[in-house]
Amino acid sequence: MTVQLSDEAYAVVEGRHADPFRYLGAHPEDGGTMVRVLLPDAVAVEVIGDNGDVAPLDQAHPAGLFVGPLPGASPRYTLRARFGDTTVELQDPYRFPPILSDFDLYLLGEGTDQRLYDKLGAHPMELEGVAGVGFVVLAPNARRVSVVGDFNFWNPLRHQMRVRGSGYWELFVPGARAGDHYKFDLAGPNGEQLPQKADPLAFAAELRPKTASIVVDATTLPRPRPAPENINALSAPMSIYEVHLGSWRRKEGDQWLTYRELAEQLPAYVRDMGFTHVEFLPVSEHPFDGSWGYQPTGLYAPTSRFGSPEDFCALVDACHAAGIGVILDWVPGHFPDDPHGLGNFDGTALYEHANPMQGRHLDWGTLIYNYGRTEVVNFLTANALFWLERYGIDGLRVDAVASMLYLDYSRPAGGWIPNKFGGRENIEAIDFIRRFNTEVYGKFPHSTTAAEESTAWPQVSRPIEFGGLGFGYKWNMGWMHDTLNYISKDPIHRKYHHGQILFGLHYAFSENFILPLSHDEVVHGKRSILGRMPGDEWQRFANLRAYYAFMFGHPGKKLLFMGSEFGQEREWSHDRSLDWHLLEYPKYSGIQALLRDLNKLYRSLPALHQLDCDPFGFEWLITEDANRNLFAWMRKGNDTRARCLVIVNFSPNVYQDYRVRVPFPGRWREVFNSDSAGYGGTNVGNGGEVRTLEGLVPELSLTIPPLAAIFLTPED
């Protein structure tokens, strides 16, 4: 049978047709039904009608185009194809109805589909009783999109997709299943071949250096049990242990722990240490280990370095079972330009800005999301909701917020484009951030969001209706820089830098602050936290103990990067485990014991956490004793007698009969002393308690230990 091929047929066999359904599949013709099938490498093809009748199809083109009449009246049919010596029966993807409904397309076009991840990507499903996988991807400027994978020998002609409204391409692939590897193969606007792309909404991916996406049936993922309901409340204690999963601990052969091995070890350790939360450095799939996860290519996929999505669920569940909240470091500000990633996705700047003065980050060599596109904003906000809904995550810490807020961030004069008002504020990014926070808190009111924002942008953690950005918390980068600079000075010089400790309290309640001693402070030549401490061996450890106590007595929630809790000497490296062997030595185990006790005290004393973000929870008592490097303040809780006196001595001298006024007469118990011998100190202190002196105003006469902090509370 000679078949005259149309231009449309050539477009299909040459892989440049935007809607192959118009040609392939079953179509009425000359009073009957004609079936057209594209099966590259097939030697012969037969069509089996719904009535069981079999008819051979004629090869109309050597690329694998077969054409012939459909036996019977039913539009349903099966194909029987011979590939070499193998004969298989298979379903024709071009006989099935669309995946996306008109309402789906409406929401996608609006950019308001909060459950975008239920529509886009790869989803195992059943259509007309046939099992397979539905694939959907956004590529509005592509000339042709195919899905390639294990199910079609990675041949882009086999499963060409059809474009629907707003540039969404879709195809149901019968026989594909969970576990299959796949990518999208695209022809650009001018028909040019593009690098094969990973699925932007894939739920799993291959281990680097491979880059294929993996089909996951997300409906079967176990749901982690919830964390305690009010774990993120402003009035609750929040002490966060920041963790890089690949270097917390290693097993034999310097191998990573898996998610399930981490589930057996990490939550128990965090609970024993008294932390309330863990914060994971980004777990989204990323190609480069050295990015620490901050250059993700798969925002919806937990990295395969440590296991499967089910395994990650087990880790979250184990944390929740231990009463530990889970916060993820989330990166919606930029992405890498790896060929398989989001950059130039459909041959155009789809996710990023086309102009490099807007679309490329000069410091990191990454691409910047175009927050002016509704599809991009929908993609990012839905991703935030995805982690909270599918994995039970309790909060998101948003990375590099300052780089999102300012159009001139880290750009030279003349190297940036002002907004429509001539200013440097990124109006679209501000709108995105507010929408993100609105949707997160609207759907998950007990969750939390935190901003790593390093400038003086106002009201980062204030309600949107009052002009804020809507975050729950903001990292206090100013406190971190000032106090680390102060503590790194020799004590004899600290009196000249007294204001660095005082200054932070001028703005301590302008935001809901987290005090961060994060991974960024122990890399790139900055040294470890212990490595910054001046003096001889004893002074270094005493300084560190005093500094940690100062931090836990200071208003604000707490965050400490792994290893700092026991005095890691070396800078952190993502390529090796923490130096756990140091705990064999008392000076390091003493630091660990101090952190454990500080966490316990912070959680148990309402005065230390209830009003962390409220000026009524803090009162300066001594601010002007610069010559002694000494500070004193009162922390307060909601109850009248919920008080904790904090005194910090950043000098190596012991001060006897040091007078401090207090609100209540009677006994005050010394509940914490960083100079305790149990922590490696000299055991100078007040014998566990002290009584107020007789007089009109209650006053304590105290012995202040060297390079140390003491906490005292009134006896009931």
Curated annotation (Swiss-Prot):
Pathway recorded for this protein: Glycan biosynthesis; glycogen biosynthesis
Keyword Transferase set for record: yes
Domain of life assignment: Bacteria
GO cellular component, one term: cytosol
Active site annotation, chain numbering: D399 (nucleophile), E452 (proton donor)
Enzyme class: transferase
Keyword Manganese: no
Alphabetical UniProt keywords: Carbohydrate metabolism, Glycogen biosynthesis, Glycogen metabolism, Glycosyltransferase, Transferase
Secretion signal, residue range per the UniProt entry: none
Documented EC number(s): 2.4.1.18
An individual GO BP term: glycogen biosynthetic process
Family annotation (InterPro entries): A-amylase/branching_C, Branching_enzy, GlgB, GlgB_N, GlgB_N_E_set_prok, Glyco_hydro_13_cat_dom, Glyco_hydro_13_N, Glyco_hydro_b
Catalytic activity, as annotated: Transfers a segment of a (1->4)-alpha-D-glucan chain to a primary hydroxy group in a similar glucan chain
GO molecular function annotations of the record: 1,4-alpha-glucan branching enzyme activity; cation binding; hydrolase activity, hydrolyzing O-glycosyl compounds
Subunit structure: Monomer.
Similarity remark: Belongs to the glycosyl hydrolase 13 family. GlgB subfamily.
Function comment: Catalyzes the formation of the alpha-1,6-glucosidic linkages in glycogen by scission of a 1,4-alpha-linked oligosaccharide from growing alpha-1,4-glucan chains and the subsequent attachment of the oligosaccharide to the alpha-1,6 position.
Name the record gives this protein: 1,4-alpha-glucan branching enzyme GlgB
Species for this entry: Rhodopseudomonas palustris (strain ATCC BAA-98 / CGA009)
Gene: glgB
